[in-house]
Swiss-Prot record:
UniProt-listed InterPro entries: PSII_CF48-like_dom, WD40/YVTN_repeat-like_dom_sf, Ycf48/Hcf136
Subunit structure: Part of early PSII assembly complexes which includes D1 (psbA) and PsbI; not found in mature PSII. Binds to the lumenal side of PSII complexes. Interacts with YidC.
Organism whose genome encodes this protein: Prochlorococcus marinus (strain MIT 9313)
Protein name, entry field: Photosystem II assembly lipoprotein Ycf48
Membrane listed as a keyword: yes
Example GO BP: photosynthesis
Main location: membrane
Annotated domain remarks: A 7-bladed beta-propeller torus, about 55 by 55 Angstroms, with a depth of about 25 Angstroms and a central pore.
Assigned keywords, A-Z: Lipoprotein, Membrane, Palmitate, Photosynthesis, Photosystem II, Signal, Thylakoid
Amino acid sequence: MSRLFSNLFNLLLIAAIGFGLSGCVTSRLPVASTSPWQPLELNTESNPLDISFSDANHGFVVGTNRLIMESNDGGVSWKKRSLDLEEDENFRLISIDFNGNEGWIAGQPGLVMHSTDAGKNWSRLKLENKLPGDPYLITNLGPNNAELATNAGAIYRTSDGGTTWKATVSEAAGAVRDLRRSAAGNYVSVSSLGNFFSTLDLGQDVWQNHERVSSKRVQSLGYQPNGELWMVARGAEIRLNDQPGNVDSWGKAMIPITNGYNYLDLSWDPNGGIWAAGGNGTLIKTLDDGKSWQIDPMGDTQPSNLIRILFDTSSESQAKGFVLGERGHLLRWVG
């Protein structure tokens, strides 16, 4: 009889724990009645990683497995392109940036390409074999000028179209999982394990390390429109700097929804809304600085992790936005 009661107690305990855990990970938000996103299919198994336009209509998307596609209608449709690269190299094209007709591509392993005719032709540039890390981010700074950051936190600049590169930091930051550059020329990076982050302000030549704000490992960091930082951490935590100019001062953690998936990116749309994207089609927005959130109905239907949100607001009348997913999934901002 005692064994019977013991087994019954264990069953009840397991059921109670299961119910409690399910309550922790299935919270839901209201679903928005409409979506400003239009789904596009790139018809590829590759993951799109970055997008840039040379003008209002003409642009490129790049990604894994040598993915490069071209659009001539503002990103409504895309056609496959190819680059003159070794057939046996499976390049990961991770960053692209245009300023008018001049464009740059950074890829892994050890790839930087340059175009001066809006991407009709691309030339591969030679890089030093001892370059710390692999190219991670390329930024167009004007005619023949660009800045290259590696996944080890090394920063290089060229002023002659990529013929020569000059280091701008005295030593690399170490292996990073995420690295971003602000419009003002500042950098922020997340260590490979997510246990700290580093900043490099314009004019500095040494990275400054900062402790994470909680026990949760940092997933990604970036810049708000006002130049302050935002942080996404494991456990679906979102934080914003709450003191101007103080990168170590963070507001209370926002956890809009706990569905078992981490957020991977955060971005501000042209109307001031804040968007968070993450695993299993997670795409949510807030219109009141995080006080309340809604699930986007279009993102919720995507059979993909949503890994990056990009907005280009340089032209107020023709603002562009994209959410990049996996296996060719792409959402286009239609406002």
